[in-house]
């Protein structure tokens, strides 16, 4: 003891007495706490880690580095052995101390032996540096520095000096070891560096300060980022496939809890249990560092108050400040790293599971809007809501600590803040009861609006032809306003919750000080205030997060409800196993190719007493029993709504309600299925045909020839690489059907199921396709395939091997071979067909080049690239003030002024009390405590009121105003965009504007804007308070704020791009989702569900990359700002301790610093969120300004409502082109273009004349209808060459033109599901109920209305068959004519019909023509028709087109008799 001079070195202490300036720990304390305890824990953890790594294979090279590490570690171990020998043999109590010193040295040597093994295993078998080893080395270095100081202070003898020297040498080697262990091993990994993220090889320190993101920031600052080239890949654990498997297993384990609340939440927690727990340790550490602040403030104020304290204590306080605030920064960084990682793993789990469940669902349970909203909006709200998930348990710990420590300062008065908190909890709980319900209602409104908008985008052509764009546009805008109104009810609750959340932090100090009996001085005021701040700040954050957390659980419940919907059950039965060779339905030697007309053979598919329906109340097919022969062609015919499409779906196992048996060879074999409405994806023609199959050039060319697609591809600028647009919008109806048929034929299968796929083809093209595919030498016969073709084309019946005739009541009327049914049946004899027709038809061969005319809409890929690319460039522009101006122009000025003024008042109310407490502590005004408490309460009340006013102005008024105007702006742009825009622009990208971007404007943008305004004024007010306590620190403000400004500029360059990439990466994900929903029957029939799930996972992984990196980038910013606050805090302490400043103002500064760092971080983050959220406004602005309108300046003429009265149409010398270079009308330079849709067109139609447009597929028939409706523009110098009833066509406003002309599209359109029969029939609401009922009766749909109760009942479009939809669409046209006649007593007008009878049988076609003949007797009619018998019977004139030219006009009856005429050739083909 004599050597050390200390009285307690051999006791636990921990502080020494009587030596080393009384500023050191005792040796026993150092041996136990700084040596033995951490070493023992490390050895235990290290051995466990070595055992884990022992079973892994070697994945890292770098043997030179590994040898260097081991050499340094061995040298350190040797020195540790020397220290053990010295401590064991020394007689000096200063070194030996007691037996704990020897134990410490022994453990020190042992731990380095273990370190040797751990380093060896970690280097070769783990991708990143050892977290256990590097953390322990850092800790040990810090602890050893303390011990080293003690030894050198004791160095009064050779033995002690020798021990201290060796100990110092070990510290140097430990530093070297730490630096070596921190070396990144990416260059030595055995994997490809390009396939992995730097995150996977980063050390814990690298992750903690987000240094692994530097590459992203550097690239983002220099150039425009792209996802595939610049963004890091996701690591293995975040891959969607891995996450999906985890959630699937976890969710399946709780199958007994179906329908119970929180089932999905619990399953998600189990699936991500490790990522969920990892943030706990740094969060606990953060609590410790935060609660060290009040003790630190207490120590600092005591130091400043007592002038006789040793100066060393001041240095200790500076060191303590460094440790505390650095600890807060690092623990916060690590917490958010692990937490954000967990959140995006949850996103991957949920999004992939929703998609997979969608592919398993029944067709009736899958709706575009609802399911897409689950995958997009609901999942995003879950991630947003769970940001504060760990705060709930952490806040309980913090509240308990805060109450305990506050009680020690204020006595029983600590209860008063608890009362305030409990009252706020009660208020928040009461509000929370309504949050879930109001949010659900709001989300339902969003679903409906997005669903209708997506329907508009996909059906814009038919909507414009129908002339109902305006009422549909008004309906969408009305739904948007209702959505905002419902959303405001939810937002009011958010404002109330936010206001209540700030009450504890604002009013608790006032209440606590008012009720305390303690004597309040500077020390007690500021220490108590710091405890209250730590007690109430977490509660404020928690209260604010309550609505978001509740919303997250509501969204989880919505997703769970969807996931628990009973999946589609394949009720079909297999009769024999799948062939192992290629998945075909036929056994390899089962059948030989059979000739035509050999009759039925072995049954491939059987239905026994089957009944099938789409609702439980009504069966579409009843009691049917059929057999489908192998290797044969079976035709299914029947009247409209007899159930032909349902028959196809029944064979696929897709009808939700069924009875009886459906027997197939194998339920796992693919079926080449073609839907009646072709399902095509937004991709190239080649991609649509091949899909997920392996490319086989021979098979591919064979299919192109069979479907007559070669000529179509030859005239396209990019051939089969041409992008066809969403829903194949750039293709004609017949071309869509042939591409769909080509996909089915390309599939490796022996069974084709074709649902009326030839209805959109002219007779000659249809016959040739039929011959090439189903004829005696057709592709189907050569493959010995079995085919079922549902059709209205009775001319093919003699070619069938087997015929199934469905009756109107959904039963099988007759079935058998053609010969059998012709002899004994009822249906066939009435058709006038004979077997002789077979030979003449099948032997005729039309050359391919004559079958398909070389005129079609040309894909405008250049336009697509320019428009979308321009939107991206506009969105990524840095600091575009025009975007902010555009946003603020959409809101009222008074709301903006209210926001700014209330923000200033909030900052004053929140921060002035800190200065006031300094005056109070020194009693500057010589008044009682009540005076100071009263003034403090006044300012805190001002804070709460100002917050409420600011939130109301931004979240309610600004959101509502901007939401209406911005949506209306882009909606008008959408409905007025030229048709060319829709043929080339990605469906998902446009839908994303109305879903994701609108969600940002309604939700994230106003909240971020509110917080930014609040934080701007708050930060500047805090800066004033800090400067009052440390005036010299104010000198550094320009430097500090310059650093922050440069940081945010550097940061924003990248974060803005990441946010936009995040939004853009979701577009293909959502588009694919919608494609899957539309084509789910095709996907499942062709057994491509697994491939589609994998493709979805690839898209999800792609969308995760920018979203995850953006979240990490935001935490990088927060960490950097926390480190800046650390520097400021150390500066305040240094100035205060060295200059001995006023204790009251020093307390103000430190108390303010406790929140200032968080406020600065929040300001930058909120401002960044505003910047990236304003990107949504930028995209909307760019969309509205850069997407041209189809309306031109001179089109301002609005004819009288009764126009046209006569129907006189004159088209003289007009050519038209689908322009691809700009949005101006096509110019005369295009006249020689080979891509002219119409060339030198002259058609004169007299009033009341009935004109049919005929010609082969692609000849330009539909283009004339589009021309008359201004959906296709004539060349610019010919726009005056079209006149209707004397009115110059080029002057009439386009939307008015389409309302005045009555047109019926080929593809009927309906209002969103749930709209009434009357609303669909009369979108303009100008007809009476009686008129609507009369029209329904005339089009034979009265029963449909009666089944629903009334015409005001809501309907779904899929309740109608394809034929019924056409009749309904015709009924809409009839109603418009009758209303016009009632209002204006006008009998004449113009009716345009685009192949309206393509989806109906001959009987229904005759009904359609009779209705047209009777209703539109005085109208001029222009109709596209492939059914020439109708033309012969009902039309006065026919216009025959070929390759966009009029090649013949005249009376169809005369032309049919004229030998060699174009029409006579078509008529001859029709007769065959």
Swiss-Prot record:
Keyword Transmembrane: yes
Record field: transmembrane: 32-52, 67-87, 100-120, 163-183, 197-217, 271-291, 316-336, 386-406, 412-432, 493-513, 534-554, 900-920, 938-958, 1003-1023, 1024-1044, 1116-1136
Keyword Magnesium: no
Pathway(s) this gene product operates in, as recorded in its UniProt entry: Secondary metabolite biosynthesis
Subcellular location: Cell membrane
GO molecular function, one term: ATP binding
Membrane topology: Multi-pass membrane protein
Glycosylation sites: 682, 696, 763, 784, 843, 1101, 1277, 1293
CC per GO annotation: plasma membrane
Binding, ATP: 638-645, 1255-1262
Domain called ABC transporter: residue spans: 605-834, 1218-1468
Effect of loss of the gene: Leads to reduced virulence. Results in a substantial increase of fusaoctaxin A, and abolishes the production of fusapentaxin A and fusatrixin A.
Domain ABC transmembrane type-1: 284-551, 900-1139
Induction or repression: Expression is positively regulated by the cluster-specific transcription factor FGM4 and is induced during infection of coleoptiles of wheat seedlings. The fusaoctaxin A gene cluster is silenced by H3K27 trimethylation by the histone methyltransferase KMT6.
Coiled coil spans: none
Keyword terms, alphabetized: ATP-binding, Cell membrane, Glycoprotein, Hydrolase, Membrane, Nucleotide-binding, Phosphoprotein, Repeat, Transmembrane, Transmembrane helix, Transport
Family per similarity comment: Belongs to the ABC transporter superfamily. ABCC family. Conjugate transporter (TC 3.A.1.208) subfamily.
Protein name: ABC transporter FGM5
Gene field: FGM5
């Amino acid at each position: 003891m004599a050597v050390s001079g200390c009285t307690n070195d051999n006791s636990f202490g921990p502080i020494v007495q009587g030596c080393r300036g009384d500023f050191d720990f005792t040796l026993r304390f150092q041996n136990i706490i700084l040596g033995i305890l951490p070493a023992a824990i490390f050895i235990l953890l290290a051995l466990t880690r070595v055992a884990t790594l022992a079973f892994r294979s070697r994945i890292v090279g770098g043997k030179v580095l590994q040898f260097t590490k081991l050499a340094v570690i061995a040298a350190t171990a040797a020195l540790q052995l020397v220290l053990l020998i010295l401590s064991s043999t020394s007689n000096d109590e200063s070194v030996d101390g007691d037996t704990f010193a020897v134990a410490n040295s022994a453990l020190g040597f042992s731990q380095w032996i273990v370190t040797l093994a751990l380093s060896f295993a970690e280097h070769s078998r783990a991708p990143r540096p050892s977290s256990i080893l590097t953390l322990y080395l850092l800790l040990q270095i810090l602890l050893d520095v303390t011990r080293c100081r003690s030894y050198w202070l004791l160095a009064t003898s050779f033995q002690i000096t020798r021990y201290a020297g060796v100990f110092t040498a070990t510290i140097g080697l430990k530093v070297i070891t730490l630096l070596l262990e921190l070396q990144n091993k990416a260059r030595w990994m055995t994997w490809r560096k390009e396939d992995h993220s730097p995150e996977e090889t980063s050390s814990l320190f690298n992750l903690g300060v987000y240094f692994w993101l530097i590459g992203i920031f550097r690239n983002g600052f220099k150039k425009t980022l792209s996802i595939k080239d610049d963004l890091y890949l996701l690591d293995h654990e975040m891959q969607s496939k891995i996450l999906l498997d985890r959630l699937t297993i976890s969710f399946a384990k709780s199958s007994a809890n179906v329908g119970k609340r929180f089932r999905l939440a619990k399953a998600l927690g189990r699936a991500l249990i490790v990522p969920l727990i990892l943030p706990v340790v740094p969060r606990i550490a953060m609590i410790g560092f935060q609660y060290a602040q009040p003790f630190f403030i207490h120590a600092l104020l005591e130091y400043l108050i007592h002038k006789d304290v040793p100066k060393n204590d001041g240095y200790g306080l500076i060191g303590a400040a460094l440790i505390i605030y650095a600890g807060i920064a690092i623990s916060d960084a690590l917490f958010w790293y692990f937490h954000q990682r967990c959140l995006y793993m949850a996103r991957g789990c949920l999004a992939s599971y929703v998609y997979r469940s969608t592919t398993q669902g029944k067709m009736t349970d899958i709706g575009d809007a609802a399911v897409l909203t689950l995958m997009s909006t609901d999942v995003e709200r879950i991630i947003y809501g769970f940001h504060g998930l760990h705060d709930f348990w952490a806040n309980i710990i913090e509240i308990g600590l805060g109450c305990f420590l506050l009680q020690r300062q204020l006595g029983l008065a600590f209860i008063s803040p608890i009362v305030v908190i409990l009252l706020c909890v009660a208020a928040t709980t009461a509000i929370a009861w309504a949050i879930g319900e109001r949010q659900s209602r709001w989300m339902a409104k969003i679903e409906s609006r997005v669903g209708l908008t997506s329907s508009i985008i996909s059906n814009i052509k038919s909507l414009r032809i129908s002339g109902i764009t305006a009422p549909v546009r008004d309906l969408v805008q009305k739904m948007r306003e209702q959505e905002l109104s419902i959303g405001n009810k939810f937002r009011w609750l958010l404002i109330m919750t936010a206001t209540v959340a700030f009450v504890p932090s604002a009013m608790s100090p006032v209440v606590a000080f008012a009720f305390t009996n303690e004597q309040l001085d500077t020390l007690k005021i500021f220490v108590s205030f710091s405890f209250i701040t730590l007690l109430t700040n977490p509660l404020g954050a928690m209260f604010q997060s309550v609505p978001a957390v509740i919303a997250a659980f509501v969204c989880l419940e919505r997703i769970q409800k969807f996931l628990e919907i009973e999946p589609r059950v394949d009720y079909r039965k297999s009769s024999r196993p799948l062939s192992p060779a290629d998945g075909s339905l036929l056994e390899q030697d089962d059948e030989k190719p059979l000739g035509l007309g050999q009759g039925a053979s072995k049954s491939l598919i059987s239905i026994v007493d089957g009944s099938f329906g789409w609702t439980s109340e009504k069966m579409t097919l009843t009691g049917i029993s059929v057999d489908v022969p192998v290797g044969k062609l079976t035709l299914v015919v029947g009247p409209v709504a007899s159930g032909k499409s349902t028959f196809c779906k029944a064979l696929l196992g897709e009808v939700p309600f069924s009875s009886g048996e459906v027997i197939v060879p194998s339920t796992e074999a693919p079926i080449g299925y073609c839907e009646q409405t072709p399902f095509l994806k937004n991709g190239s023609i080649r991609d649509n045909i091949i899909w997920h199959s392996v490319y086989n050039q021979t098979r591919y060319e064979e299919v192109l020839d069979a479907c007559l697609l070669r000529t179509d591809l030859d005239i396209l600028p990019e051939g089969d690489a041409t992008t066809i647009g969403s829903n194949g919008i750039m293709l004609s109806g017949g071309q869509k059907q042939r591409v769909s048929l080509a996909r089915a034929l390309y599939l490796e299968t022996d069974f084709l199921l074709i649902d009326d796929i030839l209805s959109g083809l002219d007779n000659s093209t249809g016959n040739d396709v039929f011959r090439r595919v189903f004829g005696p030498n057709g592709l189907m016969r050569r493959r010995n395939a079995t085919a079922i073709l549902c059709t209205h084309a009775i001319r093919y019946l003699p070619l069938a091997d087997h015929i199934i005739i469905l009756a109107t009541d959904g039963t099988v009327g007759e079935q058998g071979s053609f010969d059998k049914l012709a002899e004994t049946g009822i249906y066939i004899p009435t058709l006038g067909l004979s077997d002789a027709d077979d030979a003449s038809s099948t032997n005729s061969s039309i050359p391919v080049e004559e079958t398909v005319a070389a005129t079609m809409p040309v894909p405008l890929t250049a336009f697509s690239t320019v428009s979308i690319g321009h939107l991206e460039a506009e969105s990524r522009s840095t600091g575009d003030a025009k975007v902010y101006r555009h946003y603020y122009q959409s809101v009222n000025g008074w709301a903006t002024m209210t926001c700014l003024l209330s923000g200033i008042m909030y900052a004053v109310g929140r921060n002035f009390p800190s200065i006031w407490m300094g005056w109070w502590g020194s009693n500057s005004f010589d008044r009682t405590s009540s005076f100071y408490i009263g003034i403090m309460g006044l300012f805190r009340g001002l804070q709460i009121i100002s917050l409420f006013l600011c939130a109301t102005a931004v979240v309610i008024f600004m959101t509502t105003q901007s939401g209406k105007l911005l949506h209306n702006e882009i909606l008008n742009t959408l409905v007025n965009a030229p048709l060319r825009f829709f043929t080339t622009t990605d469906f998902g990208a446009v839908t994303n504007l109305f879903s994701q971007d609108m969600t940002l404007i309604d939700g994230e943008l106003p909240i971020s804007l509110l917080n930014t305004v609040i934080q701007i004024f708050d930060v500047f007010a805090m800066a004033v308070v800090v400067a009052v306590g440390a005036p010299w620190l104010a000198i550094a403000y320009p430097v500090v704020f310059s650093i922050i400004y440069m940081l945010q500029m550097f940061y924003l360059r990248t974060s803005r791009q990441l946010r936009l990439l995040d939004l853009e990466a979701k577009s293909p994900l959502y588009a694919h989702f919608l494609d899957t929903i539309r084509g789910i029957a095709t996907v499942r029939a062709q057994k491509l569900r697994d491939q589609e799930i994998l493709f979805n996972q690839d898209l999800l992984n792609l969308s995760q990359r920018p979203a995850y990196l953006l979240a990490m980038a935001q935490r990088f910013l927060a960490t950097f700002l926390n480190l800046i606050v650390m520097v400021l805090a150390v500066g305040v302490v240094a100035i205060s301790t060295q200059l001995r400043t006023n204790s009251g103002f020093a307390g103000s500064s430190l108390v303010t610093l406790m929140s200032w760092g968080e406020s600065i971080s929040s300001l930058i983050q909120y401002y960044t969120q505003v910047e990236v959220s304003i990107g949504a406004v930028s995209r909307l602005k760019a969309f509205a300004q850069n997407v041209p309108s189809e309306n031109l300046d001179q089109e301002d003429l609005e004819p009288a409502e009764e126009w046209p009265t006569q129907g006189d149409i004159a088209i003289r010398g007009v050519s038209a082109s689908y322009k691809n270079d700009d949005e101006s009308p096509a110019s005369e330079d295009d006249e020689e273009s080979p891509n002219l849709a119409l060339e030198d067109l002259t058609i004169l139609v007299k009033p009341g004349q009935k004109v049919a447009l005929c010609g082969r597929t692609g000849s330009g028939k539909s283009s004339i209808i589009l021309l008359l409706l201004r959906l296709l523009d004539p060349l610019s110098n010919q726009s005056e060459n079209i006149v209707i009833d004397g009115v110059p066509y080029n002057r009439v406003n386009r939307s008015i033109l389409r309302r005045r002309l009555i047109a019926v599209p080929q593809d009927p359109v309906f209002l969103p599901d749930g709209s009434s029969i009357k609303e669909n029939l009369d979108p303009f609401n100008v007809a009476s109920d009686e008129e609507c009922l009369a029209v329904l009766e005339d089009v034979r749909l009265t029963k449909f209305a009666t089944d629903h109760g009334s015409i005001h009942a809501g309907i779904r479009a899929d309740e109608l068959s394809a034929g019924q939809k056409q009749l309904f669409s015709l009924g809409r046209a009839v109603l418009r004519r009758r209303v016009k006649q009632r209002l204006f007593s006008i009998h004449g007008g113009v009716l345009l019909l685009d192949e309206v009878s393509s989806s109906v049988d001959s009987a229904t076609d005759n009904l359609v023509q009779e209705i047209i003949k009777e209703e539109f007797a005085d109208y001029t009619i222009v109709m596209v028709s492939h059914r020439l018998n109708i033309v012969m019977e009902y039309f006065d004139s026919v216009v025959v087109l070929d390759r966009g030219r009029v090649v013949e006009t005249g009376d169809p009856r005369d032309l049919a008799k004229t030998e060699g005429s174009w029409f006579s050739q078509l008529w001859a083909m029709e007769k065959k």
